[in-house]
Amino acid sequence: MLYDVQKIKEILPHRFPFLLVDRVTALTSEESIEAYKNITINEEVFQGHFPIKPVYPGVLVIEGMAQAGGVLAFVSMFGEEASNHDEKIVYFMSIDKAKFRVPVTPGDKLVYRLNVLKHKGSIWILEGRAYVDDKLVAEAELKAMVADKEK
């Protein structure tokens, strides 16, 4: 375990029910991250998506990848001081090449793997993939920016 949920909460501003990363298991600064979220039937989203046959929304899979990418960007830029930058936030800039291949359902361990494609200053372009049982379930190219919260 690299970062548990308490450490992740020190880095990201997201909170329940929108914190979509439970743990970071691998991180190489300015290169890559692996993290996961355990999907349970208790997720609020399953009350409406879909009650008879619950499917975790693809948009939340992408958001989880983006949050993992936010941890990677913060740790890459600020190192061990990543949790001491409350004045900064990561914003999504774009999502490209998104594909959803297999539905994610309750009981799945959703693993996010992201690699840095390009990084310049506070701008990050990441290749993200999500897996369940080592099977690719979704992928996307994400662009994000670390910015001041007040701007």
Curated annotation (Swiss-Prot):
Protein name according to UniProt: 3-hydroxyacyl-[acyl-carrier-protein] dehydratase FabZ
Database matches in PANTHER family: 3-HYDROXYACYL-[ACYL-CARRIER-PROTEIN] DEHYDRATASE
Family: Belongs to the thioester dehydratase family. FabZ subfamily.
One Pfam family of this chain: FabA
Species the sequence originates in: Wolinella succinogenes (strain ATCC 29543 / DSM 1740 / CCUG 13145 / JCM 31913 / LMG 7466 / NCTC 11488 / FDC 602W) (Vibrio succinogenes)
Record bears the keyword S-adenosyl-L-methionine: no
EC numbers for this chain: 4.2.1.59
Biological process terms in GO annotation: fatty acid biosynthetic process; lipid A biosynthetic process
Keywords: Cytoplasm, Lipid A biosynthesis, Lipid biosynthesis, Lipid metabolism, Lyase
Keyword Glycosyltransferase among UniProt keywords: no
Cellular component terms (Gene Ontology): cytoplasm; membrane
Enzyme category, top tier: lyase
Protein location: Cytoplasm
Gene3D superfamilies linked to this entry: Hotdog Thioesterase
Function, in words: Involved in unsaturated fatty acids biosynthesis. Catalyzes the dehydration of short chain beta-hydroxyacyl-ACPs and long chain saturated and unsaturated beta-hydroxyacyl-ACPs.
Residue positions of the active site: 49
InterPro entries on file: FabA_FabZ, FabZ, HotDog_dom_sf
Catalytic activity: a (3R)-hydroxyacyl-[ACP] = a (2E)-enoyl-[ACP] + H2O
Single GO MF descriptor: (3R)-hydroxyacyl-[acyl-carrier-protein] dehydratase activity
